Amino acid sequence: MNLAWKEIKFYKFRFILIMFIIFLMAIMVLFISGLAQGLARENISIFDQIKGNQFVVQKMKEPQLEKSILSRSKQDNISKIIDEKPFKMAGKTFKINGNEENVMAINSVKNHQPNLKSGHYPKNGNQIAINEKLTAEGLYLDDKVKVKGDDTTYKVVGILKNTMYSHSNIVMMDQSKIEQSSNVATFYVTNQLSKSDKNKINHIKGVQTATTDNITSNIASYKAEQTPLDMMIISLYIITAIVLSAFFYVMTIQKTSEIGILKAIGITTKHLLTSLILQISMITFIGVAIAEVVILLISQILPVSMPFHIDMHNIIIVLVIFMIVGLIGTSLSFIKLIKIDPIEAIGGGQ
């Protein structure tokens, strides 16, 4: 540890340069990760909010909430098995400041209501709660809004916290208003579903159970967006490993004579390797930590309309991966350090 720290202080400019490179790479990875998470949440954040992991929907090859049509008789049969009220979902077009905004309207179901950022849930047919992203369109608490094809003027009484489905903002409104639409989807959400109840539901003609993963995997935009973004993140990790490998390998070559002298005076290869690992770990940790602080600060000032999300889970994962990638990327330096002969390094072989 002492040797590693002394070398960092002696070659501080060199190590600051590497730390800066790590900082830039971490910024890129974190920002793209934040965008990937943000885009993902615009497709599936409703599932975090409605507090359920089992769904009862219309039987279909690729279950999708907005396509789940359940007749009254099927709903009656389902209600005999699970003690849950159904969700109703329909597309609506809001008129906001002269512009049209397509949204997904859902009703309020006890124990499965999305979290509120401010205000309260609708209490009558003239009230609505909107997703927070709609505030970027100029819609706020107590504002009035019209819906295309509906004569009712709605009052915004609540702001929902990050609730979206398939890139559509979720708006909570009275069930009777949703059922006025031509295509109304019906589905059930539950937390607990026994094997027996699941079998009973699946035996109802035209009805099936589905997990959150079943539903999200069939959202076309979710699948289309995540794969290329994930590949970009993986590519950045590979580039990071290559860059760090080049930097540390060149540094090791430049220090060949110093390493040879240290070996000649009795410093073991194990001690030198430990010193190198500590150097890599320290500058990688500091570089990534600074990048994470910067990204967290940036995330606080980004507009709500921008799909960006970063949390402690992402922060920890990026830090751990960078530490691992940093060590893997410097494996060539380990090999070079082990092979350095003290006599040749200090010119004794000539």
Curated annotation (Swiss-Prot):
One of its GO terms (cellular component) is plasma membrane. The chain crosses the membrane at residues 15-35, 233-253, 276-296, 315-335. Its main location: membrane. Keywords: Cell membrane, Membrane, Transmembrane, Transmembrane helix, Transport. It is a multi-pass membrane protein. It is found in: Cell membrane. Part of the ABC transporter complex hrt involved in hemin import. Responsible for the translocation of the substrate across the membrane. The complex is composed of two ATP-binding proteins (HrtA), two transmembrane proteins (HrtB) and a solute-binding protein. Belongs to the ABC-4 integral membrane protein family. HrtB subfamily. This is Putative hemin transport system permease protein HrtB. It comes from Staphylococcus epidermidis (strain ATCC 35984 / DSM 28319 / BCRC 17069 / CCUG 31568 / BM 3577 / RP62A). The gene is hrtB.
